[in-house]
From Swiss-Prot:
Belongs to the TrpF family. The keyword Mitochondrion does not apply. The keyword Chloroplast does not apply. PANTHER family: N-(5'-PHOSPHORIBOSYL)ANTHRANILATE ISOMERASE. InterPro entries: Aldolase_TIM (IPR013785), PRAI_dom (IPR001240), RibuloseP-bd_barrel (IPR011060), TrpF_fam (IPR044643). It catalyses: N-(5-phospho-beta-D-ribosyl)anthranilate = 1-(2-carboxyphenylamino)-1-deoxy-D-ribulose 5-phosphate. Keywords: Amino-acid biosynthesis, Aromatic amino acid biosynthesis, Isomerase, Tryptophan biosynthesis. This is N-(5'-phosphoribosyl)anthranilate isomerase. It holds the Pfam family PRAI. SUPFAM superfamilies: Ribulose-phoshate binding barrel. Its EC number is 5.3.1.24. One of its GO terms (molecular function) is phosphoribosylanthranilate isomerase activity. Pathway: Amino-acid biosynthesis; L-tryptophan biosynthesis; L-tryptophan from chorismate: step 3/5.
């Protein structure tokens, strides 16, 4: 999940849940390190195969992360083969799922960067013993499924889980998700120093799947990078004007 970047802290910025071309283009221009594209049908930010390909054509391939919640390990290999993406983010997978995904990827000769999303529960880290991942993402869960809740993880719990993950023998990078927005990083500056990546989705939206361009600019300005863009004289929700 490594990517070259300069900011006020050594932390990657991922803007996830991108559904509209204009949001993808702005996120890239503002200097986001990673752009998350959700290919999960239960999500209001779900991209169909065609929509996924359309967005991928607009952004640097090294920034693309496809978010999956596979019901079958073969789905992961199929998406990688179809899109050529270098990074995938896996949600709601069990240890058995992880073993199956590892086997299928190996059989097909794929070696993507893998992020595994887990809830802030110590037992959730067992999955790390069954699949090679470069990053673990802490995210809230509901009904046994990680992500999509928009709920923030309490800071003390998030930082405690961070330390626990750091002690794992695989020593993966650690990302934090769940309702993060500009105010989150202002109120919790330790996140900028402790986590390897911060994932912003619902916290910078006007509505599900519609990014608020004013909030995106505010976030990236605070992070010390706006891709050289000047703040427009008038910012409207969902669009620059």
């Amino acid at each position: 999940m490594n990517s070259s970047h300069e900011s006020l802290a050594d932390v990657l910025v991922k803007i996830c849940g991108i559904k509209r071309p204009e949001d993808a283009i702005l996120a890239d221009k503002l200097g986001a390190d990673l752009l998350g594209l959700i290919h999960v049908e239960r999500s209001p930010r779900h991209l169909t195969g065609r929509e996924l390909e359309d967005i991928l054509s607009l952004i640097p391939p090294e920034k693309a992360v496809i978010v999956l919640e596979p019901s079958d390990p073969v789905e992961v290999a199929e998406v990688i083969e179809r899109t050529g993406v270098e990074r995938v983010q896996l949600h709601s997978i069990s240890c058995e799922d992880a073993r199956g995904i590892k086997r299928v990827l190996t059989e097909n000769g794929f070696n993507p960067g893998i992020t595994v999303a887990v809830p802030p529960e110590p037992g959730s880290l067992d999955v790390l013993d069954h699949i090679p991942c470069s990053c673990v993402m802490l995210d809230s869960s509901s009904g046994g499924r990680t992500g999509g809740t928009g709920r923030m993880i309490p800071p003390e719990l998030a930082l405690g889980m961070l330390r626990l993950i750091r002690s794992h023998e695989s020593a993966p990078e650690v990302a934090l998700a769940g309702g993060l927005g500009p105010s989150t990083v202002r109120l919790n500056p330790e996140y900028l120093l402790e986590f390897d990546c911060l994932d912003f989705n619902s916290g910078i939206e006007a509505a599900p799947g519609i990014k608020d361009h004013a909030m995106m600019f505010e976030l990236m300005e605070y992070m010390g990078r706006t891709g050289g863009l000047q703040k427009p004289s008038r910012l409207q929700r969902g669009e620059l004007s």
